[in-house]
């Protein structure tokens, strides 16, 4: 399995596979992969003509994403499972969305479980809230504005 570090040279390859991505994670973009790969120690591999990102610790892939591409992801998923079995590492995937887990459950009923990692959760915002920056103001800002108003009387 060739493990590849995202780079400018691999951007076109990433873009090719990521055009088939239908999942919501912002991590599934070539730009984010290039920008964050060193910080999060992420790399990628191509298995069965499918893109699979992986987290690396001490040069060893320790967890993978669900395969992305135009083909059926089952064969690539099976290659990931084989990797863990051959490496004697515990099976681990990250960024598994409900639709992905449903596929895994159809292929291998009851064999895998999913755990929610709140520390890795994305935040959702309403467009209107971001556009108007509506929301509770910091207490110090509120007090400052009240003080300014009284001073101008």
Regions found by a protein language model. Give the residues of each.
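Conserved small/polar residues in nucleotide/adenosyl-binding loops
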Residues: 142-149
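Short, His- and charge-rich active-site/binding loops that engage polyanionic ligands
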Residues: 137
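Amide-forming acyltransferase catalytic core, primarily the GNAT-like/NAT-type
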Residues: 1-48
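Conserved donor-binding loop and adjoining core beta-sheet/short helix segment
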Residues: 29-99
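Short, glycine/charge-rich beta-strand/loop segments that flank catalytic centers
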Residues: 90-106, 118-121
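Short acidic (Asp/Glu) patches
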Residues: 77-78, 106-110
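Active-site/acyl-donor-binding loops of N-acyltransferases
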Residues: 113-132
């Amino acid at each position: 399995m060739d493990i590849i570090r995202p780079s400018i040279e691999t951007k076109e390859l990433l873009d090719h596979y990521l055009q088939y991505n239908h999942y919501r994670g912002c991590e599934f973009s070539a730009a984010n992969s290039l920008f964050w790969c060193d910080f999060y120690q992420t790399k990628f591999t191509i298995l069965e003509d499918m893109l699979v990102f992986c987290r690396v610790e001490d040069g060893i892939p320790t967890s993978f994403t669900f395969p992305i591409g135009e083909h059926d992801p089952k064969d690539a998923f099976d290659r990931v499972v084989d990797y863990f079995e051959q490496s004697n590492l515990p099976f681990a995937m990250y960024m598994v969305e409900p639709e992905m887990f449903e596929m895994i459950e159809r292929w291998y009923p009851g064999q895998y479980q999913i755990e929610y990692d709140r520390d890795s959760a994305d935040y959702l915002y309403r467009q209107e809230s971001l556009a108007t920056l509506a929301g509770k103001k910091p207490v110090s800002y509120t007090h400052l504005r009240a003080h300014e108003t009284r001073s101008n009387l």
